[in-house]
Design a protein with these regions (language model features):
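Solvent-exposed loop/turn segments connecting transmembrane beta-strands
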Residues: 8, 46-51, 82-89, 114-124, ...
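A beta-strand-loop signature enriched in Asp, Gly, Thr, and Trp
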Residues: 87-150
Length: 213
């Protein structure tokens, strides 16, 4: 649930950015990068002469609210020009919030969207909560529960949709193993999966491991 599902922004690439932080609560970041290498598969410097550059700007507010705790509120805007691998120019936006509600509980939300027909998800809405160290066993332990609503773009998918929107309920439990690793079982329950003609429901199970160095 943490990713921007409608993003058309390049996953990597050579670029520059600048950050302005007038105080500890506010941060403004803007920049750009080469738009030609959509997948960021390698460091390429010879594409700058093509003059295709992505651009982005974000504003973040990170207050500490008395009686609640730390929070983060941010908005991002970006533009991706049309290139050979992604011919359509797109403009996207994302609004994100997260707020501690005491020492253990936190809530989060995200709303994002994108123009055009490049991303299979053109609008996404997420709301969820996490509970940290529920058994007072390991600081890395965390339980999370979230709900997402995704608008699907049929033109981007390239085939007839059975549903034009998907609803997803996700739950996970990150289980800390000492200080250096977590093991996380995760379940996603899809209601009205867009491309499944045989069922109005689908379930995805995953198991992830994360190492900390």
């Amino acid at each position: 649930m943490s990713q921007n599902g409608s993003s058309t922004y390049s996953t990597a690439g050579v670029g520059l950015y600048a950050q302005i932080a007038p105080n500890e609560d506010w941060t403004f970041v803007f920049g750009g990068q080469d738009a030609t290498d959509i997948d960021g598969t390698s460091v390429q410097l010879n594409n700058f002469s093509d003059e295709h550059y992505t651009s982005f700007a974000s504003l973040s507010y990170t207050p500490t609210i008395k009686g609640l705790g730390a929070g983060q509120y941010s908005v991002m805007l970006y533009n991706v020009p049309g290139v050979k691998k992604q011919p359509e120019t797109t403009n996207g936006w994302s609004l994100n919030i997260s707020q501690d509600l005491g020492e253990k509980l936190a809530i989060f939300g995200r709303v994002n969207g994108v123009s055009g027909h490049t991303a299979t998800i053109n609008q996404s809405y997420v709301l969820g909560a996490v509970y940290n160290n529920p058994l007072d066993r390991n600081p890395l332990d965390q339980i999370g529960l979230a709900f997402a609503y995704n608008k699907i773009d049929e033109d981007a998918v390239g085939s007839k949709l059975n549903h034009d929107s998907e609803k997803i309920i996700e739950g996970y439990w990150a289980w800390g193993i000492s200080k250096w690793m977590t093991l996380t079982p995760d379940i996603q329950f899809y209601i009205d999966p867009a491309s499944n003609p045989k069922s109005d429901y689908a379930t995805v199970f995953t198991l992830r491991s994360t190492f900390f160095f």
